[in-house]
């Protein structure tokens, strides 16, 4: 009899615990994201989804950083080196091939039966079609807000779906310290944000992939003085005469040719084109202050908004700027 009572008490305790857990674990959570009309605001999404479909590299970056990669059941083709474990072609069938970040394979998305689908701006037109399959989380970088703040907001939106907000706060506390170290090097300096592509140089607006240099680090982007930018992310063609006249203290060059693979198809390297006889007459060249983002070009071009991408970008800036600053200080002494 005592054994029966003990067993009944144990079962009751278990049921009470399960009930309490159910009461404290919500079925849905409200996050800040974009809706089908591209309006940023509150969106209700599933809490703790188990099956995740990802059609955006920045979102995949964040999901991986939060240790949630084992829940990814489908992904767009991956071109970012540190995310290749999620490449459908290399996953031995564990991850469905959902197409690309620009074009989703709707049939495959439906087949993998996701609880939630993450997309970026390139797939905004497919929001309604994807939403018919599963709830959609549409996140994008707001460059006017600043890439760091925007990345934090997006990472926190994803983290709050899984109860991992503290992980995001820890990451960004470390990022803030690194930015504080970099900021005095270029703050108030006249810089030129630019993009190299297929043997030509374009000027980049501040609200572009390179915005961290102007917005968060306080540099003055001379490119903004040249004209209006209809498509900031694509830049505007420039002439060497314009660059000579602007005479920047620093040049930052995002290498799109390398990011897209064109550099492997006979296109000249960025340095070969940019470091011509005219540019070599400028102090920015003589002082070694032309900074090329080549090694992680695809991160700068396609993954802005990911926390690991931000770590990579800060690493590139540290590697380029801190040695230059140390050299300049030594020369001044």
Placement of each model-derived feature along the sequence:
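Extracytoplasmic/secreted envelope proteins and their assembly/folding machinery
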Residues: 46-49, 56-63, 106, 124-127, ...
């Amino acid at each position: 009899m005592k054994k029966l009572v003990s067993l009944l008490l144990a079962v009751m305790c278990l049921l009470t615990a399960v009930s309490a857990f159910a009461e404290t674990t919500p079925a849905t959570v409200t996050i800040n994201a974009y809706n089908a009309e591209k309006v940023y605001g509150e969106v209700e999404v599933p809490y703790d989804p188990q099956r995740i479909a990802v059609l955006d590299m920045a979102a995949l970056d964040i999901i991986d950083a939060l240790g949630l990669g084992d829940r990814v059941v489908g992904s767009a083709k991956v071109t970012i080196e540190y995310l290749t474990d999620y490449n459908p072609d290399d996953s031995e069938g564990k991850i469905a091939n959902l197409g690309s970040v620009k074009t989703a394979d709707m049939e495959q998305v439906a087949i993998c039966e996701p609880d939630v689908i993450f997309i970026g701006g390139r797939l905004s037109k497919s929001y309604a079609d994807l939403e018919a399959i599963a709830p959609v989380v549409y996140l994008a970088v707001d460059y006017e807000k600043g890439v760091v703040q925007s990345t934090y907001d997006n990472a926190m939106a994803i983290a709050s779906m899984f109860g991992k907000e503290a992980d995001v706060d820890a990451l960004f506390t470390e990022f803030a310290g690194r930015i504080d170290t970099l900021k005095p090097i270029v703050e108030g300096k006249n810089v030129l944000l630019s993009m190299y592509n297929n043997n030509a140089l374009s000027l980049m607006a501040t609200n572009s992939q390179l915005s961290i240099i102007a917005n968060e680090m306080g540099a003055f982007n001379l490119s903004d003085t040249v004209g209006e930018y209809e498509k900031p992310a694509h830049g505007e063609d420039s002439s060497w005469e314009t660059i000579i006249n602007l005479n920047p203290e620093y040049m930052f060059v995002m290498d799109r040719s390398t990011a897209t693979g064109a550099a492997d198809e006979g296109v000249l390297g960025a340095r070969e084109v940019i470091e011509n006889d005219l540019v070599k007459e400028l102090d920015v060249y003589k002082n070694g202050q032309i900074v090329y983002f080549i090694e992680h070009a695809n991160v700068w071009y396609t993954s802005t908004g990911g926390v690991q991408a931000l770590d990579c970008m800060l690493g590139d800036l540290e590697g380029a700027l801190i040695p230059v600053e140390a050299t300049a200080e030594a020369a001044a002494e």
